Amino acid sequence: MVMTDPIADFLTRIRNANQVKHEVLEVPASNIKKGIAEILKREGFIKNVEVIEDGKQGIIRVFLKYGQNGERVITNLKRVSKPGLRIYSKREDVPKVLNGLGIAIISTSEGLLTDKEARQKNVGGEVIAYVW
């Protein structure tokens, strides 16, 4: 089966695993998925990320994070730019998610960045997803 939007699939797998409070999630690897997972780790939305090389595509193992009482750290993830409708943001118009409580993941010429990093580096790009 051909997957038309692997990023949306990755975000959906995280969302679904988060809803049923799984500790670990495994997805097929790609560079953009690794980048998104690293941003989520750096911003404190997930515990850890491991990349397992299996000689083929590889696997990304994502360790989800929950609060002390079991509450979810990730409230929601939303895919913004899709294969059928790309959404770009100029450097002046980089979006804020929930007035800074969430993050926007943006693919720029500098690589994958959060909205805050994109504003600091004064770059725009394709808005991949919102996480809050």
From Swiss-Prot:
Keywords: Ribonucleoprotein, Ribosomal protein, RNA-binding, rRNA-binding. HAMAP family: Ribosomal_uS8_B. Belongs to the universal ribosomal protein uS8 family. It comes from Streptococcus equi subsp. zooepidemicus (strain MGCS10565). GO terms for cellular component: ribonucleoprotein complex; ribosome. Part of the 30S ribosomal subunit. Contacts proteins S5 and S12. InterPro entries: Ribosomal_uS8, Ribosomal_uS8_CS, Ribosomal_uS8_sf. GO terms for biological process: translation. This is Small ribosomal subunit protein uS8. One of the primary rRNA binding proteins, it binds directly to 16S rRNA central domain where it helps coordinate assembly of the platform of the 30S subunit. The keyword 4Fe-4S does not apply. Pfam families: Ribosomal_S8 (PF00410). GO terms for molecular function: rRNA binding; structural constituent of ribosome. Signal peptide: none annotated. The gene is rpsH. The keyword ATP-binding does not apply.
